[in-house]
Structures are given as C-alpha cells and as structure tokens.
C-alpha cells in the first residue's frame, strides 16, 4: 500500500520504518489524552536510566480546537505518530529525513527546514530543546530533546519525534481539506475518505465540548481523579522506607483523567484565567508525583529486588 495514496498507508509505512530501526511498535493508550506525549510509553519511560525505543499512533483530543467540522484543518480529535528514543541517537535528524523518504517525501526535492521551537508541557512539568520540521513552508513534525519530564531531569536525554499525521497526509496527498483525505487507498465506490470516518464525530463532539458537557459533573470528575491519584500514590509504597512503588501506572491513569476533565472544562468556558492556572498546577503536581513514583519501579530504574518488595508470592494474595 503506497503511503502517498492513503492515510492508513502512511501510518503503516512509518510503523514499518521505525520497527526496522528497532522500536517497539505499541498500540494507542486507551484513555483520552491531549497529545501523544501523555502516553506512559513517553512520559514515564523517558525517566530513569534504562534504554527505550518505541513508536505508536496516539489519538489525541483537544476539545477547545473543535470547529464543528467546518474548518478544513482544525480538529478536536486527531492523530499523532510518536517516536521516543532513549538515549537520543546522534543521527536523529537523519533518521527523521529517512522516515520522510519512506512515506514518499524526498528531502532532495523538497524544502525541508528545522525551525527552532523549544517545547514545554505545563501540565506534565516537562520541557525540552526542540525544532519544528517544515516541508515546503508547512509544519509537519516536531522533534524534541527532553530535558525534564514530571519535574525530573532526564538522564540520559531522550529524543522525541511527533508527526502530525493529518497534516502530513494532506501534504503528501496534495489536498487542502482534511476530510478529503483518502483513508484506504481505494478509488471509486470503494474509496473511503477521512470525512467518511470522522466528520460526524467532529460535529457531534464539538457540540458536546462547547454546548452540552456537564460542567458540574466535570468539576466533580476532576476532584475524583485528583483524589484517586493521590490515594494510589500514597498506597503504592511498599513500606515506610519508600524504596519501591507498586502503583505508579494506576496513579498516572488518574492524572490523565484529571487532565482531560480540565481540558473539557476549559473548552466549556467555565474556568477563569486565574482558575485555569490553578488547575494546570494541580495536574502538574500529580504528574510530578507520578514521575517520582515511577523512578521507584523496576522499569523506572529501581533495582529488581527492591521493586519486588511488598509483592505477594505467586499463587498467594496479600
């Protein structure tokens, strides 16, 4: 399937390219996130000393960006292709250019530019040195050297590549409206467009996000997720010595839920400027605590013997 002919072909080509490089090809995280960076395969795995290479597609939701399906390239639900490489390889820029070639974009025939644009995620307590990747005057990707995630310095530094799949596909296919993208690579009666798959959802979720989401319920959902995250973080320590944490991932799930509730409240227009900053700081504190807990797990770099303390023997329950 030629990547320049279909949205799904583009995804398959990127998966194949990064799999050949040695990345674990993961599936999307099964929660509402605002960007591919929120997937624990990036946010948490970027922390600690262990090497990690992964790539995945992540559906991302930014409720505030919905336009009822009337804008040709602005969506409240869209797709990112995320690559995380730890430690960051010295030739990451060359790897990126080769990935473009794999989807039919020859850097010798197109004007590829890297525009400095340092990245920051206030809710994740994360930042990094970064560049936007422009192709013939249009931004199609971003790559970042993570310096800090969840308030923790990254050592080693991880390299992150984020492809905006819809925008990249529009460029490759030469269309000006996202809903006109060929999704399955077929022609005639068998052709399925991006609009066939997602236009109705864009209209309905825009209506939901801006007009009908229940603000009182969302405020309560935020409080519940915040409380659950704090509860799991406190309960996850194996002992009073706090040497190993056994529930970093369930706690982080609740952090993600709090973040999504905040994004919906923000789209609904029920949070003042002052309150908005307060909510961002509350989510950031959850993310920082989850990151600290992750560093006390085996995957986060804690020694296996330490991380297993407090676990029940197989076949038994605590």
UniProtKB/Swiss-Prot annotation:
Catalytic reactions on record: tRNA(Gly) + glycine + ATP = glycyl-tRNA(Gly) + AMP + diphosphate
Entries under Gene3D superfamilies matching the protein: Bira Bifunctional Protein, Domain 2, Class II aaRS and biotin synthetases, domain 2
Amino acid composition bias (Polar residues), ranges on this chain: 300-309
Family: Belongs to the class-II aminoacyl-tRNA synthetase family.
Superkingdom, natural source: Bacteria
Region named Disordered: 298-318
Entry-linked SUPFAM superfamilies: Class II aaRS and biotin synthetases
Biological processes annotated in GO: glycyl-tRNA aminoacylation
Keywords, in A-Z order: Aminoacyl-tRNA synthetase, ATP-binding, Cytoplasm, Ligase, Nucleotide-binding, Protein biosynthesis
GO cellular component: cytosol
Listed Pfam families: tRNA-synt_2e
Lineage: Bacteria, Pseudomonadati, Pseudomonadota, Alphaproteobacteria, Hyphomicrobiales
Enzyme Commission number, as recorded: 6.1.1.14
GO molecular function: ATP binding; glycine-tRNA ligase activity
Subunit: Tetramer of two alpha and two beta subunits.
Subcellular location per the Swiss-Prot or TrEMBL entry: Cytoplasm
Name recorded for this polypeptide: Glycine--tRNA ligase alpha subunit
Gene from which the chain derives: glyQ
Main location: cytoplasm
């Amino acid at each position: 399937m030629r990547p320049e002919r279909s949205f799904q072909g583009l995804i398959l080509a990127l998966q194949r390219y990064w799999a050949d490089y040695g990345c674990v090809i993961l599936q999307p995280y099964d929660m509402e996130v605002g960007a591919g960076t929120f997937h624990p395969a990036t946010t948490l795995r970027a922390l600690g000393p262990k090497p990690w290479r992964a790539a995945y597609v992540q559906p991302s939701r930014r409720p505030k960006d919905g336009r009822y399906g009337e804008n040709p390239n602005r969506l409240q639900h869209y797709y990112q292709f995320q690559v995380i490489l730890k430690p960051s390889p010295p030739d990451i820029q060359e790897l990126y250019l080769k990935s473009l070639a794999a989807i039919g974009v020859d850097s010798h025939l197109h004007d590829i530019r890297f525009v400095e644009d340092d990245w920051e995620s206030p809710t994740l307590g994360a930042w990094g040195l970064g560049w936007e990747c422009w192709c013939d005057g249009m931004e199609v990707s971003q790559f970042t050297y993570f310096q800090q995630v969840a308030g923790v310095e990254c050592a080693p530094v991880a390299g992150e590549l984020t492809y905006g799949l819809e925008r990249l596909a529009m460029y490759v296919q030469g269309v000006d409206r996202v809903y006109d993208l060929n999704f399955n690579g077929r022609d005639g009666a068998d052709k399925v467009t991006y609009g066939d798959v997602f236009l109705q959802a864009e209209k309905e979720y825009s209506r939901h996000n801006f007009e009908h989401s229940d603000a009182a319920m969302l405020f309560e959902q935020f409080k519940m997720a915040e409380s659950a995250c704090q509860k799991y973080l406190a309960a996850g320590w194996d002992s009073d010595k706090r040497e190993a944490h056994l529930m970093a991932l369930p706690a982080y799930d609740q952090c993600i839920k709090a973040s999504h509730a905040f994004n919906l409240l923000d789209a609904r227009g029920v949070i003042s400027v002052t309150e908005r900053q307060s909510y961002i700081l509350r989510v950031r504190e959850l993310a920082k605590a989850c990151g600290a807990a992750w560093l006390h797990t085996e995957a986060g770099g804690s020694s296996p013997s330490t991380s297993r303390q407090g676990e029940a023997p197989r076949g038994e329950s605590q």
